[in-house]
Amino acid sequence: MDGKVDIVLNLSFKFLMKIFYENYWKERGRSGNRPRYRIFSQWIDEGSRVLDVGCGDGYFGEFLVNNRKVDYTGSDISDTALQTAKSRGLNVISLDASNDLDRFAPGSFDFIVMSEFIEHVPNSEEVLRIAGRIAKKGVLISIPNIAYWKFRLQLLFGNFPKQWAVAPEEHLRYWSVDDFKKTVKSIGFEIKEIKASNGKKILRDMWPNLFGFQVCFYLKPKSL
């Protein structure tokens, strides 16, 4: 009986997530260039096979294909986002990565990119574990940093920081840079590089946990 209840709850959650992100992309509209895209492209070898999880409307995918000549696959739960990504000439698939990422065999891709994605899923650690098996060379992630100095001030004065694009319920997980480092190390990754993509450069490079607004991680499974 408990197993049937779990299945029903899981299917219900998937359905609600699907509806939420269809509306999300309709309300948000198109994305644009982001500093983190340049960081990711510097980490990715030219010609690599790349899976972009939560690819959205494909702006990053187009940037990556044009600049690194990669074999690109984008995935997203939103058909609205995927239609826009397809219009950019990208190879994309419909995928609920919080449940179905394990459809790919180990070593299927050189790199997996999760750009401002992992905070949107409830089972972040499990998704990261699976990504570590699928990626040959590394998993590239960016997260919003809840310990950014402006957010600390907002909390000090009793206000929760606004990190979302459309609605507060889109973010299910929150990390500081130091918290995320502990999380990924606990599930078997080594951190090859950390780079903040927003904020004053000299400060964000020295103290990313304080002065990095969005922070990029180059992760490698310890077995690689």
Question: Language-model features: where?
Answer:
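A short glycine-rich, Lys/Arg-flanked "PGG" loop and its adjoining helix->strand segment in the class I
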Residues: E126-L140
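A SAM-dependent methyltransferase catalytic signature shared across enzymes that methylate proteins
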Residues: D178-S197
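Short N-terminal helix/helix-N-cap motif within the alpha/beta-hydrolase-1
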Residues: P122-E126, F151
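Conserved N-terminal segment of class I S-adenosyl-L-methionine
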Residues: D2-F111, L128, R173, I194-L224
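Active-site micro-motifs of SAM-dependent methyltransferase domains
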Residues: N99, E119, Y148
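A short SAM/SAH-binding and catalytic strip from SAM-dependent methyltransferases
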Residues: V113-P122
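Conserved class I S-adenosyl-L-methionine
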Residues: L140-K162
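Acceptor-substrate binding/catalytic loop of class I
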Residues: K162-D179
